[in-house]
């Protein structure tokens, strides 16, 4: 005989753990964004950290520089020219990321998503920041594996050419100006997309609401440096 709790719909169950006192069981609820100026609301966004303390930048692996040497990271602009709340918000995301397990992340994500009128179908990791180390790659791929069971695709970009991606199976990664085993996509910044686009490369329309190339495997994409 099934217990009474077995009859509780997922949406009602999710409400218990994401609102009121239950919000303490679901801290991820305040750390996920639904889309932005370019991404659709069906894409959840989570950062492993802010651009200002990006591991790739600290290791001199970031390639977001103009020919004259000026740093042109788009994520950094949000922390320096927009609301002062952006940086502390991303620091909270970093704090959460460093202690959460893949299983806990996905459990909370699914509960939050169950309450949405327009559910997320994708998770974009690292609108800002990058992998802190190898354990972040492993955790992110496990999250991607678990979310795939719920028909949510997980993808990201990285400058961390020093890390090992050979065991990545589910996370769709675009290497920023580099590609190696385990990274199926290549994403390049160029000065002029007409003049500098290599043969076989697609041009980023800079509007993810009409394009999904970066979440598909086997893509080569150029974007105008901005």
PLM features: residue spans?
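Class I S-adenosyl-L-methionine
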Residues: 1-226
């Amino acid at each position: 005989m099934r217990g009474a709790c077995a009859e509780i719909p997922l949406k009602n169950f999710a409400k218990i753990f994401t609102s009121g006192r239950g919000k303490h069981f679901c801290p991820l609820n305040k750390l996920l964004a639904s889309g932005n100026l370019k991404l659709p609301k069906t894409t959840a966004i989570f950062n492993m950290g802010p651009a200002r303390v990006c591991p790739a930048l600290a290791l001199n692996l970031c390639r977001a520089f103009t020919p004259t040497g000026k740093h042109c990271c788009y994520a950094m602009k949000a922390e320096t020219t927009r609301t002062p709340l952006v940086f502390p918000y991303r620091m909270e995301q970093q704090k959460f990321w460093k202690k959460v397990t893949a299983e806990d992340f996905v459990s909370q994500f699914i509960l939050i998503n169950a309450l949405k009128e327009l559910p997320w179908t994708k998770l974009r990791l690292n609108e800002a920041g990058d992998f802190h180390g190898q354990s972040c790659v492993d955790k992110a791929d496990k999250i991607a594996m678990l979310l795939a069971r719920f028909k949510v695709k997980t993808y990201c970009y990285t400058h961390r050419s020093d890390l090992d991606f050979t065991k990545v199976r589910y996370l769709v990664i675009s290497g920023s100006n580099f590609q190696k085993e385990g990274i199926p996509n290549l994403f390049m910044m160029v000065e002029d997309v007409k003049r500098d686009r290599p043969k076989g490369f697609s041009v980023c329309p800079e509007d993810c609401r009409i394009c999904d190339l970066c979440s598909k495997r086997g893509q080569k994409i150029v974007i105008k440096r901005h």
